[in-house]
A protein has these predicted regions:
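Alpha-helix-loop-beta-strand connector modules within alpha/beta enzyme cores
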Residues: 12-29, 165-174, 217-235, 285-299
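Residue-level detector of conserved catalytic or cofactor/ligand-binding positions
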Residues: 332-342
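Active-site beta-loop-alpha junctions enriched in small/polar residues
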Residues: 32-34, 59, 90, 109-111, ...
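Conserved alpha/beta-domain cores
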Residues: 128-236, 242-253, 260
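Short beta-alpha connecting loops at secondary-structure transitions
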Residues: 206-207, 238-252, 266-277, 303-307
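Glycine-rich, proline-tolerant flexible connector loops at the mouths of alpha/beta enzymes
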Residues: 1-11, 150-158, 205-210, 271-279
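Beta-strand/loop-dominated core regions that host nucleotide or nucleotide-derived cofactor-binding catalytic loops
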Residues: 33, 38-140
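Long, charged amphipathic helices and adjacent flexible linkers at domain junctions
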Residues: 119, 128, 176-179, 227, ...
């Protein structure tokens, strides 16, 4: 979201605050990724009725209650009979009965209102989409030249998506792969190997998969990231009620705490701070929960119990020994220096 001028302004503000606080602040830039949307309707909105038929096609004609343009030929190339399409964050569900290279005739499984340019998800297939759109490529080059720390890739499906982005980034930023599609879950081990970090983006993941599948997937992905020594972020709808309320629900607080107890390296706000009415309170709440959990003796016990077998390298042995010394003697700082660099 936002123009390059707006992004440059936000970047400058963050760096100014960083200097004022004399504390490093990492900046993560989130690329939009391939967004799939339907076209427009003559009336702006139509009501789809369960059991009736609805067509998606490439025609330029304005949408009606019976059909609408879906300007993505790559979707039709990948569809098959029995495949599902989810529209408007999964509120509308269609099942493909017949399809060709420029159309899909569907039955309406879950009905409701459909309006102009609503998003489309296709959970059953790997779409032949480029990992980066032309807009993404332009944005990527701009923000890397601006000077960011992390780059988040949206809707990755396979390891090749990250490799393509890495070649363009060329070491100017570290790459976070957002796991928000079933295909990414299936290919997670390969994606993890070529990523600098992972974001468990539960929003779209919960649209394309049954919602009850998301918590165990979150737990498994976090554990795999810890085992691989890769940072992992848990994101989306963590304090969703704070978009409109100054206080979170108890369930939301528990959800945030659970993500921390699982071993997440970061917990992330979305609409709460980007578009909500109480952004400062949301950040304060998130921070307070993190401080409380990490000061709980149970947290240390859980992290210790979940530690995997040590690796056998000399570096891992040194780090493990330093950790034991720090814990045993209650050190507040470990000083590390290299001959070719300034002490850090």
């Amino acid at each position: 979201h936002g123009s390059h001028d707006e992004i440059a302004k936000w970047h400058q503000i963050i760096r100014q605050i960083e200097n004022e606080l004399d504390s490093p602040i990492a900046i993560l830039a989130d690329l939009q990724g391939p967004k799939l949307r339907v076209g427009e309707f003559a009336n702006g909105v139509e009501e789809l009725i369960v059991g009736e038929k609805f067509r998606l096609d490439l025609s330029d004609e304005i949408g009606t209650k019976n059909r609408v343009r879906l300007p993505h030929p790559e979707i039709f190339q990948a569809l098959h009979e029995g495949a599902h399409l989810l529209i408007n964050d999964g509120k509308i569900k269609l099942t493909v009965e017949k399809c060709g290279l420029d159309f899909a005739d569907c039955s309406i499984v879950n009905g409701g209102e459909i309006s102009d340019r609503k998003g489309v998800n296709v959970p059953d297939v790997i779409l032949p989409l480029a990992a980066l759109s032309e807009k993404d490529r332009a944005d990527l080059d701009f923000i890397c030249e601006l000077g960011i720390d992390w780059l988040a890739l949206s809707f990755v499906q396979r390891a090749d998506d990250i490799i393509e982005a890495s070649n363009l980034v060329a070491g100017r930023a570290a790459i976070i792969s957002k796991i928000e599609k079933p295909s990414a879950v299936k290919s997670f081990e390969d994606i993890l190997k070529v990523s600098d970090g992972i974001m468990v983006a539960r929003g779209d993941l919960g649209v394309e998969l049954p919602v009850q599948n998301v918590p165990p997937i979150q737990k498994r992905l976090v554990r795999k990231c810890r085992a691989a020594a890769k940072p992992v972020i848990v994101a989306t709808q963590m304090l969703e009620s704070m978009v409109e309320s100054p206080m979170p629900t108890r369930a939301e607080v528990s959800d945030v705490a659970t993500a921390i107890y699982e071993g997440s390296d970061a917990i992330m706000l979305s609409a709460e701070s980007a578009a909500g009415q109480f952004p400062i309170q949301a950040v304060e709440t998130m921070n307070n929960v993190a401080i409380e959990v990490e000061s709980d003796p149970t947290y240390t016990e859980v992290m210790e119990a979940s530690r995997r077998a040590k690796r056998n390298s000399v570096a891992d042995g040194i780090v493990s020994a330093a950790r034991e010394i720090a814990e045993t003697t209650d050190l507040s700082l470990i000083h590390i220096s290299e001959p070719t660099r300034q002490p850090c």
